[in-house]
Amino acid sequence: VGPRSDKKWASGASEKLYKNLKHALEEDSVNLPRLECKYANARVLSCGGTGAQWLAQAPTCHLTQIPDDDMRTVIRFRLGKETFCADVCPHINADGVPCGKQCDREGRHLLSCPSGGGFFVGHDSVCATYCALAAGADGIPGAQAAWKPRVDAWPRSTRGAEADAGFFRLPGSRDTYVDAVCSYANPVTYRGCDSTAGTVAEWKARKKNAEHPVFDAQNHRRLHPFDFRALSFERHGYWAKETVGFTKKLAFARASVLGLDPAAEICRWYGIIS
């Protein structure tokens, strides 16, 4: 698949994916319980947008290559098919205590289990990918990244109060700290995610910004010389608008410095991260 306009592809793919899956969903869900229909609607809405870019790009480069077995699992996951064959959750928390809860075949519990090792692996993998794309050997010339930096402006009152990564010496930008969150759009937990795409991703992004203030809430004056951006994703693929904008900004910076086609570079970043 050749380079495409990032906005045109993302919106077009999202619309087609939503229409096709919703039509199939309506046919399959006639006899489903109401809650199962809500789960299915939330999943379909969460699959589209920029987060679907990987469908058009795997495997156009080594960073988008996916083993066949993993590809099958990913497709099954996004189609709402069974992806987990065990009965009991295998997760163990940081204190060594196993979860032990009963698991559903669709993996819903695994996606939201607070003790999940896979939960943190996925989160850290996304952050590491951003660091590599922006400041790795083939990243933005001159850019630097810091992993889990301490930021005195945001004391660590909870595990997630400080930043996951910091990006420095970005062309035309302030130093920027980011904090990531990968959430499961569960209609039982998040009201409205079965009727509006991106409900969970956008809510989590707002929450991250509230935890990492850069401007005074009363007079809106800048408090710090740096910026903050939330990297907020839904597990089925949807990205918060703020996350899309920051990713596009980084990709455009690299394209500008290296004389690349901005649209193709933005698509490349979307595909690798998604």
Regions found by a protein language model. Give the residues of each.
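Generic recognition of stable, solvent-exposed alpha-helical segments in well-folded globular domains
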Residues: G12, K16, F84, V121, ...
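Short Cys/His-based metal-binding microdomains
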Residues: A94-V126
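Class I S-adenosyl-L-methionine
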Residues: V1-E26, A132, R169-L170, A251-S256, ...
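Generic alpha-helical structural element
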Residues: D6, A10, T60, T64, ...
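Active-site metal-binding core of divalent-cation-utilizing nuclease and nuclease-like domains
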Residues: T64-R105, T129-G192, A201-R206, A210-E211
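Catalytic cores of nucleic-acid endonucleases
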Residues: W154, T158-A163, P171-T176, A180-S274
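Acidic catalytic cores of enzymes that act on phosphate-bearing nucleotides/polynucleotides
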Residues: V1-K81
